[in-house]
């Protein structure tokens, strides 16, 4: 069924197909045609949260929390929405999303296009979803990098009451200078500020919402070691490895190899796994890792768990394989 749908969708502009697919999924869900499945096939504890299974949806598919209920019916163990910023922003000019089917890859330079944190919260409040919901937060493009912490703090405060966990996205390649926040001193200052705010909010709301940070695949071992040291010292609750890569050498002479943006899907598989393995070695079990990047079939999810991840997330694989990928991953993890 999905291979036929994919042929039709891949004939459309990538971004238009993205919105069409989500709208269609939402309509089918509202008509009651998606059998809601809990998929408690492999329960796992992540950052103190009880997941029915370890296969989650990565941020980026539902940027504004408009499709939470429909996505929640597909059997994910957890869902992450965003990236969201304090204020609405249009993102980068179109075209900004490209498929590379020969390599099962996707290039995006979306640029955190979203309706803002207030609109997202309204969508969450309308949702009936009762599962584990992560909110991925970022900074507005117009905010100077030296003031980035202000944007993250605004989003953290507003999202706190509505999230099961919150992810600090400092690794998108499509917001100018954002990845500089992965540097030791910059990272330490940002995460310390967020952890202090987290403690205040936990007291106010009477609940503890875990904080994770999402890192890039384009890091050398020294940088990974520095990040591991910082996240352990500030006592982050989790880390997500990885975001998209800016390295498109795997595409060879493909016409899209020169496009700006982050590359995801199969081409990021090895780079993401390398970071995951090194990170797991340096973290030494002090906090859980969510593995994401290049999961195109069930054995890819199982490989990330073997390399040290507690849970995994998928996105690009869904575009190429459809919702059946979730069950395929769960089957592989159950073996």
UniProtKB/Swiss-Prot annotation:
The UniProt entry lists membrane topology as: Peripheral membrane protein
Instruction: Write out the annotated subcellular location.
Output: Cell membrane
Query: Known EC number(s)?
Result: 1.3.5.2
Q: Which Gene Ontology molecular function entries are recorded, alphabetically?
A: dihydroorotate dehydrogenase (quinone) activity
**Keywords noted in UniProt:** Cell membrane, Flavoprotein, FMN, Membrane, Oxidoreductase, Pyrimidine biosynthesis
The catalytic residues are: 172 (nucleophile)
Pathway as given in its UniProt record? Pyrimidine metabolism; UMP biosynthesis via de novo pathway; orotate from (S)-dihydroorotate (quinone route): step 1/1
- Which reactions are catalysed by this chain? (S)-dihydroorotate + a quinone = orotate + a quinol
Query: Where does the secretion signal sit in this chain?
Result: none
Cofactor annotation remark: Binds 1 FMN per subunit.
Chief subcellular location equals membrane
Residues binding FMN are: 59-63, 83, 136, 169, 214, 242, 265, 294, 315-316
- One Gene Ontology term from the biological process aspect of the record: 'de novo' pyrimidine nucleobase biosynthetic process
Record's InterPro entries? Aldolase_TIM (IPR013785), DHO_dehydrogenase (IPR050074), Dihydroorotate_DH_1_2 (IPR012135), Dihydroorotate_DH_2 (IPR005719), Dihydroorotate_DH_cat (IPR005720), Dihydroorotate_DH_CS (IPR001295)
Residues recorded as binding substrate, renumbered to this chain, are 63, 108-112, 169, 174, 243-244
* Record's keyword annotation contains Flavoprotein: yes
User: A single GO CC term, please?
Assistant: cytoplasm
Cofactor(s) needed by this chain = FMN
PROSITE patterns given in the database record: DHODEHASE_1
Can you tell me which family this protein belongs to? Belongs to the dihydroorotate dehydrogenase family. Type 2 subfamily.
Summary of subunit composition and partner proteins: Monomer.
Q: What does this protein do?
A: Catalyzes the conversion of dihydroorotate to orotate with quinone as electron acceptor.
Name under which the protein is recorded: Dihydroorotate dehydrogenase (quinone)
Which species is this record about? Neisseria meningitidis serogroup C / serotype 2a (strain ATCC 700532 / DSM 15464 / FAM18)
